Amino acid sequence: MKRVCLFMTLICMMMVSFKPDGSDGHEGHGYVDLGLSVKWATCTVGASKPEDYGNYYAWGETTTKSSYTESNSKTYGKKMGDIAGNSSYDAATANWGGSWRMPTKAEMQELIDKCTWTWTTQNGVNGYNVKGPNGNGIFLPAAGCRGGSSLDSAGSGGDYWSSTPCDYGRDYYAYGLYFGSDGQGMGDYYRCYGLSVRPVVE
C-alpha cells in the first residue's frame, strides 16, 4: 500500500512540474522561455487565454477607454523616453505588477529575427504561432487596433506596442510590432491609437 501511495505521489509531482511548452509564471501570469533575452507572456494584457484579444491601450497609458483620439491621448506630442517598467506609463507594469513590463523595440525585433512565425488559427482565432530558437512558442492573436471608437483589422492583422518612442524627433509616434498573414515587421504608430500589449519579464 505504501508503495502504491508513493508511486501515485511521484506521478502527481511529475504532472505538476512537467511543462511541455516551456511555460512558467510570475505574479499570477504565465510566460514562455523562447530562448531569447527576455521571457514572453502567454497572454496579452486583459486576456485570460492566449487567443483572447485582451485590452487595447494608447501608448503611455495604463487604462482602456471607449475612444482613442489625439485629443484624449496623454502622451501625443509629448517628448518621452523609453517607458519600460514605469508604472505611470507602462500598461504591463501597471496592470500586472512585479517585474512585468512592455517589450522594447530591440526585444520585439529580436522576436521577429530569431523566431519562426507561422500563420495559423487557434480555437477559431487567427494569429501567429511564434516559435523560439529553443523550440518553445507563444501565440499572438490578430487582434487589430483601435482608432477612434472603431476596431480595425481584427482577425487579419495584429498591432502590439513596444515601450520605445520614435527616435527621430517625432513626438507623436512610438514603435510597434505589426503583422498580417503575409508577414511581420516593426513600424511607427500614432501614440493615440489603441494597440495590444504583450508583456515580457527578465
For each feature predicted by the language model, list its residue ranges:
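Bacterial Sec-dependent N-terminal signal peptides
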Residues: 1-24
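C-terminal, surface-exposed recognition/capping segments
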Residues: 24-202
